[in-house]
Amino acid sequence: MYLSRLELTDFRSYRRAALELDPGVNVFVGSNGQGKTNLVEAVCYLALLRSHRTATDAPLVRQGSERAVLHGEVLTSGRRIDLDVEIVPGRANRLRVNGHATRRARDLVGILRVVIFAPEDLALVKGDPAARRDYLDDVLVELRPRLFAVRAEYEKALRQRNAFLRAVAQDGQQVDRNSLDVWNLHFARAAAALLDARRRLVHELAPFVEKAYAAISGGSGAVRLEYRSTVPEEVLQDADEETRIAGILAALRKVQDAELARGLTLVGPHRDDLNLELDSRPARGYASHGESWSYALALRLGAYELLRSDGETPVMILDDVYAELDQQRRRRLTGCVSGAEQLLITSAVDEPDLPVGRRYVVHESQVHVAD
């Protein structure tokens, strides 16, 4: 799989850009602030329908414009698939696949598979649980696009339940138990589906991350991944879905008084974490700076290998990564990604350690092939 053409209209700093991309290595060179990361952000948006840099779509639209438009041409399994996304903040995206309009995100998500590693990814190891939850969910929807709807349904159920709890907390009124039971059941069903998907993913992903860490670190240190939930483990391990739902409902009842007082949901996937261990200790507190970089790289490379094992090799993106790594890790990283069908790299300078391939110069949101 590779992206053969990318077009941007009014996306971030770009009024208009159109570029042809090769399979293999494509390197975008330019000083900071010239628009390199905006290019790869557009590629990620075509894959996941969300930015890896911002939680909302408004910053994606060029200042003074009403909408941003992305077009990508993907070559996969010997056929070309055209993807079109129109981003209008505050409204649903307009999506087209091969010229046909669709309202369903899952019809587009997963066609272009992308794994990106960026300096912000140090937060996967050092940061809050939200970054690790987003990491898991992004891999989930690329691996199994139908789970885009599962995640969206959970987020909707969480918003609705929180709105109900907030209204009770603010008004100080007697809670309507029948209404609470309805919201609890809706939430528990959505939570059970997402929890099951995440736990299965961690089980599949862990061996790939362990192998990637060994390659990046030169065999120094052993890593372990574990999904930590606010729902009791014995509930999550049950094979029967209805039993898991009942267990989540029981967990909600235990914290009901606190939830009603605070006006928010205290149990569920939105409060879970991916526990990262290095040599049997929490990586967040014990890993050195270099070890943390190796761990973050291993998480991305593990996701890449898992997706590749599923039959389609993702596009690998390295966004200003080489500047963050020492020479040894640069060499090891280059070795790990050398087999990628397409590799997109951004860099402020054309580093000697960068792989050989097509070079582009990016300056003031203009892109041209280097001489």
From Swiss-Prot:
Among Pfam families, the record links this protein to:
SMC_N
Q: Does the keyword DNA-binding apply?
A: yes
Provide the GO biological process annotations.
DNA replication; DNA synthesis involved in DNA repair; double-strand break repair; SOS response
What keywords are assigned to this protein? ATP-binding, Cytoplasm, DNA damage, DNA repair, DNA replication, DNA-binding, Nucleotide-binding, SOS response
Gene Ontology cellular-component terms for this entry are: cytoplasm
Any one Gene Ontology MF annotation carried by this entry is: single-stranded DNA binding
Q: Which positions does UniProt annotate for ATP binding?
A: G30, S31, N32, G33, Q34, G35, K36, T37
The UniProt record lists the keyword ATP-binding: yes
Localization recorded for this chain is: Cytoplasm
Protein role: The RecF protein is involved in DNA metabolism; it is required for DNA replication and normal SOS inducibility. RecF binds preferentially to single-stranded, linear DNA. It also seems to bind ATP.
Q: Which family does it belong to?
A: Belongs to the RecF family.
- This chain's protein is named DNA replication and repair protein RecF
